[in-house]
UniProtKB/Swiss-Prot annotation:
Taxonomy, superkingdom: Eukaryota
Any coiled-coil regions, as ranges: none
GO BP terms in the entry: protein secretion; vesicle-mediated transport
InterPro entries linked to this entry: TVP23-like
Family of this protein: Belongs to the TVP23 family.
Region (Disordered): 1-30
Chief place of localization: membrane
Descriptive protein name: Uncharacterized Golgi apparatus membrane protein-like protein CG5021
Natural source organism: Drosophila melanogaster (Fruit fly)
Keyword NADP (UniProt): no
GO-annotated cellular components: Golgi membrane
Membrane topology: Multi-pass membrane protein
Amino acid sequence: MASATVRNVPLLDDDTIPFGEEDEMRDPSRAGQKYTHPYVTFFHLFFRGAAILIYMFCGWFSDSFITSFVFVVLFLSADFWTVKNISGRLLVGLRWWNYVDDDGVSHWVFESKNSESYQSRVNKNEQRIFWLGLILCPVFWGLFFLFALFGLKFKWLLLVMIAIALNAANLYGYVKCNYGANKDLNSAATDFVKTQFFKNAVDIMTRPSGAPPPTNVRPTGVV
């Protein structure tokens, strides 16, 4: 197969109401709620969290490695599909995908929606949860990799490597979407950590004590 090409493009617009925002369009008072996509936010964390918990505690319920392996892989697969196709697009306006053209060339596309109208609708709580879940779970699997490696548990090592591959693929794809396909990943990751740390520090210092959280979502018909 021919070598792959990479490009970073804006996320395509359409005239449909964003999934999960139909009630918000009918009732503008819902725009200020804490989570505008509560179900998407829940499942963004549920599948990957469940995979970690099953891996940690499967020995309490079954001695069968095959059973544990199947359940963990099922949850990892569900998580990979959900994060790649749903939560990234709805929670932060990012999407990455791949296609092969008629000449057999593989193209990797990293899309981002950076328009002011969209960014003004992004829920900051959901955005923070998205990135924390995307980053922290690979860290856990990295620790499990070390435990399995030094504990000489090679059959579990295979399972952990599958988990790392699936989690790292989404993390890599969304970092590329957020910072550009041509930017070095190490510098992009460093910039991301600095940006998030600065934002959290500013929020803590500037938010009045006991004040309600700011409302960042405004109803609009633009995706």
